[in-house]
Amino acid sequence: MSEHQDQNIGLTPGDRFGRFVRRADMRETLAWAVFYTAVFVVLALFFYPKWMPAIHSTNMKAIERLMVIFTIISAPVCGFVLSIATYTFRHGTRGNTPPQDSAPMRTNRLGIAVFSAVAGVLCLIAVIYGITAMNSEALAAERNSKNALVVEVTGQQWAWSFNYPQLGVQSADLNLPVDRPVKFIVKSVDVNHSFWPVQLGVKADANDVVAVEINTTPNKIGHLDVKCAELCGLYHAYMETNGEVMAQTDFEKWVTDNGGHNA
């Protein structure tokens, strides 16, 4: 029986766990874990909102909130994994002389149980929050669908076109009134595309078989970047156009100026 095994005889799982975390290597590893976790939390709370595109809809706000919360939830697990990698990098073998073997260490069941429980709870929170957010957006879209402005979106290599059947207007640019629900009906006339008005926080595949519907409510006046998010050929990177969320009076004027009628 080794000296290390003899020292563990008669110790409770809690005692072994306490001795385990007081080891020099574990103290350093845990210190790095706390550091990395704090870095990810700071990034989520203070930098992600600045790095995200401008928010012009309830959907985009929900996406920003989801990114922040998911980053915070995953920060402890990611931080612990990175701390192990950091310790290994700092104390790994250098040169041609291998280090001496450390004292043997039996599996610490309490440590494994704590890590598994924490990771499991964090994953459960992420799943519940994600499902709740998804359902709330679906319910909001259903409530607003009756009064929604319908916009038929057509993708083709390599341009977008927009038809407003309720208003009798067609356009190469996407113009929307603020604070009015919008239903996009998306399709393609050739290869697959992906309709992505960035600041609205929605995205839909465009194909030539079935039309795809997505809903949102623009809630802030401003510029929109409309892009294709699926590789669709040689000029895919240039398949983009402009958009604008405008005041209701400005939108009505745009409709009449382009030969349409206001519903």
Where are these regions (language model features)?
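Alpha-helical transmembrane segments of integral membrane proteins, especially early/N-terminal helices
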Residues: 2, 26-48, 76-83
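Non-transmembrane, membrane-proximal soluble domains of secreted or membrane proteins
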Residues: 3-23, 44-67, 89-263
